[in-house]
A protein has these predicted regions:
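Extracytoplasmic beta-rich repeat domains
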Residues: 1, 20-39, 60-84, 105-133, ...
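Structural signature of WD-repeat beta-propellers
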Residues: 6-7, 46-47, 84, 91-92, ...
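Beta-propeller domains
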Residues: 138-146, 152-155, 163-166
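Conserved small/polar residues in nucleotide/adenosyl-binding loops
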Residues: 187-189
Length: 189
């Protein structure tokens, strides 16, 4: 089955083999992230910075987790990853949040920007989140490249790199490209 969310608040499932609609539902707000799937659930984030968990069989909402909202519509998509029993995601003001896959209960949250970002969020952009299973890596257009511990949400380190491209993790080496076009490699110990 193909799972789809769109920018007019619809989410649906299509049978790939026959091209038939399995189910269609309409949410409260448009969606602003990719879809991630695990077992019988899928996850997405809407424009109100709410992570939503849906049943894959009929689209029923299982739970949701609201983070801080903003007054403007961001022009970049939010990112989410699933690592073990956690869904880890960013919102449009730079918070990184980890919640339990089954219950939606918060495990940790890390604000990466000052409260002033709410007024500047239309201009704030981040890369997609990536993980090596122990840490999360991402960067933003505020010259910050982060490594965050998955279990605790504690910042391992921050480097001065201005990039919104998705980092690539190969072993203990992280590759990214800066806004100025430089290929950078970081060794993560």
């Amino acid at each position: 089955n193909l799972l789809i969310t769109d920018n007019i608040a619809k989410y649906y499932s299509i049978n790939i083999k026959y091209g038939e609609l399995n189910w269609l539902n309409i949410g409260s707000y448009s969606f602003n992230s990719e879809i991630k799937k695990t077992d019988n659930k899928f996850f997405t984030i809407d424009y109100k910075n709410t992570l939503r968990s849906f049943d894959i069989n009929d689209g029923t909402e299982l739970w949701n987790f609201q983070t801080d909202d903003i007054f403007t519509m961001p022009d970049s998509k939010n990112s989410l990853i699933i690592v073990g029993n956690l869904v880890i995601f960013n919102n449009s003001i730079g918070d990184i949040t980890a919640v339990d896959v089954e219950t939606g209960q918060i495990t940790w949250q890390l604000p990466t920007q000052s409260s002033n970002i709410i007024n500047e969020s239309y201009n704030f952009k981040t890369s997609k989140l990536v993980s090596d299973g122990k840490s999360i890596f991402f960067s933003n257009n505020k010259e910050e490249f982060y490594s965050i511990d998955i279990k605790t949400g504690v910042t391992n380190w921050i480097n001065d790199i201005n990039s919104i491209l998705t980092p690539l993790v190969i072993g203990n080496i992280i590759f990214t490209v800066s806004e100025k076009g430089y290929l950078l490699s970081l060794i993560h110990i």
